[in-house]
């Protein structure tokens, strides 16, 4: 119904005033509804255009599935597919010497061309970015990590993967992975070592006739975040290479990304090197302690040895059981030898002191008995024959007849007398070189004066000076036998007041240490020419000097040998 007809109908049915009111209300309502209808028309037109765009993109994606077989690689039967690879390392979480592996989180991107996915270029749709669901509908390289031990694909909050399809058919696939890969390590210079760990990329089934891998951006294909850090290591740099691997099933293309790590020395200096060095220094304290303080020195030596043993055990417990020697083993082993040598040094000092003390006691006993014997002779009392095989030997001064003028004598060596079962006769006093020496007892006895340790015999020293008597035989000195007397008679040299033997033979009849007691006094406190105190004095200098020299050689050699940088390494922070 038109507006004029509606107006005529209302005019016939309603009064004129009311008719005008209704007409104005109707006109006003039409004016209000006009903008709304215009907006609805505009929205409808816009919606129609957007829908057209959706239809075009969907049509492109749907067209990929027409006569497309994802089981067949691109250019099947033709040239191999070139797959470009790039990596960007986000973080490296661990590097284990025990497990020989390392864990890293990185973006892994692959680039290849599939002509079957090319489409006509349209404005605004040169590249299509689609979700990970689309990957199930197309062919993708069967890439895997050769030295992978464990991998993790991130799915929070959605699958961390996307696909980009270029209108020319170029495909870009990007995923985020966390991989634990094996890393064989050489711990010969541990803890000053540098390790080179790598990730190897290869096709699992396609040989080089089907797929060839390459670094897509040349030397800049691998990137490492500057925020990568490890507690015990620093990332020195990385390098990349492409190789061809020959297996029984054919030749395969392989890419390798190598990352070099430098171990930080701070932990090992604080926890191992400095404590072990201080333990060695503590072991030197025993050199300044009195050698008679046996409990203190033994306790100190044993404690340092056990502490070094514990430190070595705890250090090696955190490392793999390897057969070769590490640099830290050299240091700890040397420290252990040093503290053990300190303990043996006190054992040597104690042994020498004991031997010297025993010699002093024997000398004092012999000297005391000799003085008693001389006193009896001065009193005119002739001692009865000694039933013991051991007899006493006296050192007298100038004497005449059987009388002696005793002089104080130092310690004399050990004397041993052995009997010879042939009669008895008393030796007379002999004045030799102005000194009197009387040996009272059976003449058929052998008197031995033990001066030095038996080991001195190997050095040409005099072990024993022997005065032999028997059958009138002369005393035997260091120069050979003296004059012989008749059997059963008095010894050569006369009776009670006879003259002594002349010349060198007279002095040879008596041991030299009896003629020169001062020399005996000088050497009685030494063993092998040194005293126990000398050993402590020498040790106070020798041990520190040896340890300082060892440290200088150790740190200079190992720091120089271990400072090796891999060839063609791109240092961290120098990537272009």
Swiss-Prot record:
Protein keywords: Cell membrane, Chloride, Chloride channel, Disulfide bond, Glycoprotein, Ion channel, Ion transport, Ligand-gated ion channel, Membrane, Postsynaptic cell membrane, Receptor, Signal, Synapse, Transmembrane, Transmembrane helix, Transport
GO cellular component: chloride channel complex; postsynaptic membrane; synaptic vesicle membrane
Keyword Transcription: no
Biased composition (Gly residues): 491-501
Compartment(s): Postsynaptic cell membrane; Cell membrane
Known glycosylation sites: 56, 251
GO biological process: gamma-aminobutyric acid signaling pathway
Regions that span the bilayer: 269-289, 298-320, 330-350, 541-561
Domain of life: Eukaryota
Disulphide connectivity of cysteines: 183-197
Signal peptide positions on this chain: 1-29
Parts of the chain on the Extracellular side: 30-268
Complex and partners: Homomultimer.
Role, per record: GABA, an inhibitory neurotransmitter, mediates neuronal inhibition by binding to the GABA receptor and opening an integral chloride channel.
PANTHER family: NEUROTRANSMITTER GATED ION CHANNEL (PTHR18945)
Identification of the protein by name: Gamma-aminobutyric acid receptor subunit beta
UniProt source species: Musca domestica
């Amino acid at each position: 119904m038109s507006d004029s007809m509606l107006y005529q109908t209302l005019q016939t049915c309603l009064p004129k005033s009311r008719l005008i009111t209704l007409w104005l209300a109707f006109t006003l309502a039409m004016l209000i509804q006009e903008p709304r209808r215009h907006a609805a028309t505009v929205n409808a037109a816009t919606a129609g255009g957007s829908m057209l765009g959706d239809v075009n993109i969907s049509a492109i994606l749907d067209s990929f599935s027409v006569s497309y077989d994802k089981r067949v690689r691109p250019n099947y039967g033709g040239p191999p597919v070139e797959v470009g690879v790039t990596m960007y390392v986000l973080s490296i979480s661990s590097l284990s010497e025990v497990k020989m592996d390392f864990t890293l989180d990185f973006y892994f991107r692959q680039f290849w061309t599939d002509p079957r996915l090319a489409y006509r270029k349209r404005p605004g749709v040169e590249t299509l970015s689609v979700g990970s669901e689309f990957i199930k509908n197309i062919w993708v390289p069967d890439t895997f990590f050769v030295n992978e031990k464990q991998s993790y694909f991130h799915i929070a909050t959605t699958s961390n993967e996307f696909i980009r399809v270029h209108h020319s058919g170029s495909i870009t696939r990007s995923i985020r992975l966390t991989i634990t890969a094996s890393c064989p390590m050489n711990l010969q210079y541990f803890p000053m070592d540098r390790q080179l760990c790598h990730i190897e990329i290869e096709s699992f089934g396609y040989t080089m006739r089907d797929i060839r891998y390459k670094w897509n951006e040349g030397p800049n294909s691998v990137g490492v975040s500057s925020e990568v850090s490890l507690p015990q290591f620093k990332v020195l740099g990385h390098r990349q290479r492409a190789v061809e691997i020959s297996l029984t099933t054919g030749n395969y293309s392989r890419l390798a990304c190598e990352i070099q790590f430098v171990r930080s020395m701070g932990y090992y200096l604080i926890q191992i090197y400095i404590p072990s060095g201080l333990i060695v220094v503590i072991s030197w304290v025993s050199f300044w302690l009195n050698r008679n303080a046996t409990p203190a020195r033994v306790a100190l030596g044993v404690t340092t040895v056990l502490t070094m043993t514990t430190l070595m055990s705890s250090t090696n417990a955190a490392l793999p059981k390897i057969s070769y020697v590490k640099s830290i083993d050299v240091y700890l082993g040397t420290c252990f030898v040093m503290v053990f040598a300190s303990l043996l040094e006190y054992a040597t000092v104690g042994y020498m002191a004991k031997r010297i003390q025993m010699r002093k006691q024997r000398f004092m006993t012999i000297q005391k008995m000799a003085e008693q014997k001389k006193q009896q002779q001065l009193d005119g009392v002739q001692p009865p024959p000694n039933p013991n095989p051991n007899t006493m030997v006296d050192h007298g001064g100038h004497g005449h007849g059987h009388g002696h003028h005793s002089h104080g004598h130092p310690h004399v060596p050990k004397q041993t007398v052995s009997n010879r079962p042939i009669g008895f006769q008393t030796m007379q006093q002999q004045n030799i070189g102005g000194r009197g020496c009387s040996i009272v007892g059976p003449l058929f006895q052998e008197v031995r004066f033990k001066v030095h340790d038996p080991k001195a015999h190997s050095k040409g020293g005099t072990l024993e000076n022997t005065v032999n008597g028997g059958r009138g035989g002369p005393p035997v000195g260091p120069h050979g036998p003296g004059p012989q007397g008749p059997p059963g008679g008095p010894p050569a040299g006369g009776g009670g007041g006879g003259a002594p033997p002349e010349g060198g033979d007279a002095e040879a009849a008596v041991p030299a240490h009896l003629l020169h007691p001062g020399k005996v006094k000088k050497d009685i406190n030494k063993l092998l020419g040194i005293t126990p105190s000398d050993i402590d004095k020498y040790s106070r200098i020798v041990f520190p000097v040896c340890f300082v020299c060892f440290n200088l050689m150790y740190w200079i050699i190992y720091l120089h040998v271990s400072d090796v940088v891999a060839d063609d390494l791109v240092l961290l922070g120098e990537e272009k």
